[in-house]
Amino acid sequence: MAPALAVTRDLTAVGSPENAPAKGRASVYSEVQSSRINNTLPLPSVLKGAFKIVEGPASSAAGNPDEIAKLFPGLYGQPSVAVVPDQDAPSSAPKLKIGVVLSGGQAPGGHNVISGLFDYLQERAKGSTFYGFKGGPAGIMKCKYVELNAEYIQPYRNQGGFDMICSGRDKIETPDQFKQAEETAKKLDLDGLVVIGGDDSNTNACLLAENFRSKNLKTRVIGCPKTIDGDLKCKEVPTSFGFDTACKIYSEMIGNVMIDARSTGKYYHFVRLMGRAASHITLECALQTHPNITIIGEEVSAQKQTLKNVTDYMVDVICKRAELGYNYGVILIPEGLIDFIPEVQELIAELNEILANEVVDENGLWKKKLTEQSLKLFDLLPEAIQEQLMLERDPHGNVQVAKIETEKMLIQMVETELEKRKQAGAYKGQFMGQSHFFGYEGRCGLPTNFDATYCYALGYGAGVLLNSGKTGLISSVGNLAAPVEEWTVGGTALTALMDVERRHGKFKPVIKKAMVELEGAPFKKFASLREEWALKNRYISPGPIQFTGPGSDSLSHTLLLELGAQ
């Protein structure tokens, strides 16, 4: 057996230019990383031979089609397309000049979208030029880019992270910013641009496509669906990349914590999971690991639950488990829980208003300006959370909701309620809470076989769409429960995913976030099992992500259930 220290490989020693690391990339890789770099990915059969683009019927919008039509006069109504085999189609295309940008937070697989797009250009449009815009959309506006070639891309194949060209959260939305993007497109003579991002980024990609078309620029814009949160999806886009990997990383850690809880027999682990809006990650991790309690934000909202309702539900389960001799357990909480509780939102709105105009006095006279319901809720909160609400403001003077550590708040609220029940003789157990936040750990892991392959197909498909003269579409790969060879490839009209929101008196286009559907198969399966999980320890420890052998090609429960394949 090789010694433990021999698990790294210096790619500079390989001698092949394809394996030379890009500037700024660590040159030392683990054995697993090295094996992933050199792993060849399969493509859907339709992308292996000659093919053509077939257009579907005219599209509409997810909501308010009349308003979307006004906002996108050049793109609205365009059809979605499918790539289909065609032996008579040419197998090669004229060379192109293409740019790519990573936008928003990291998600495992982003590098493979770029690799797939690059390989399409190498194989089908020989002699093409490929630019990577550095640091997100700001790189487009400032014309900061790097020319991507085989040597530069190779060390990033099948690797996590966005560090090949890095990402950013800037938006191209003002007239000046659109003008900067136009100047960059003209300067580099771009035939196309691929925007890899979430719902906001793809909304901006559509606005950019509309702008370029209105100015008669030849630059076409295609989006790719990225977000670990899993809230960018529809019938044609079954999942966003990164969700599969992130959920498996979190589920491994949750499984480890479960075994720890069972081993010590004395801790309740409160685990907050990333997902600012939708609770998809929390639901998927619950299906993978079977925790005792899982809070789904969309259900809390639908049932108009209060913070006390949520706390009482947890305490009820903890008391029942204590009667069975279990003084331990695992509780999953979505990051965006606070946003789903109407009374908390009302309290925050009132605090923002009061603190914008008042100095908070130590005697608490300012509290008289709160409504009765908000005052009652404020007094219910632990002191540390009260201080956080009062003191930590963003640059606009508002409460920083994202910084509220919900898991710690709930531990304190559960402790308080359990103490009351103990005094009343209704609880005889022992309670010790441990808090965790699993978030950043899942954003840049080595992508699973599914995410690596899915992203590669998305990138290759984006190249096909650009070469076919399409713009304002999002690269779409479907039939994902089937073997890779049978996956379908196409493009979905971005305007078909859009609705409008009223902001500052104007309609703004937005791609609607896909929330957890309480009538959907994933939630229904969870709901049918949660009572059993609450009192019986049905813990599953999935272990680390596998790249070969059992479990290596498994798909998320959410995807399989939504596709009707489980």
Curated annotation (Swiss-Prot):
Domain of life: Eukaryota
Binding-site positions, diphosphate: 105
E.C. designation(s): 2.7.1.90
GO molecular function: 6-phosphofructokinase activity; ATP binding; diphosphate-fructose-6-phosphate 1-phosphotransferase activity; metal ion binding
Keyword Mitochondrion: no
Keywords: Allosteric enzyme, Cytoplasm, Glycolysis, Kinase, Magnesium, Metal-binding, Phosphoprotein, Transferase
Site (Important for catalytic activity and substrate specificity): 200
Active-site positions on this chain: 229
Annotated positions of the Phosphoserine modification: 16
Record localization: Cytoplasm
GO BP term, pick one: fructose 6-phosphate metabolic process
HAMAP family according to UniProt: Phosphofructokinase_II_Long
Protein name: Pyrophosphate--fructose 6-phosphate 1-phosphotransferase subunit beta 1
Organism field: Arabidopsis thaliana (Mouse-ear cress)
Encoding gene (name): PFP-BETA1
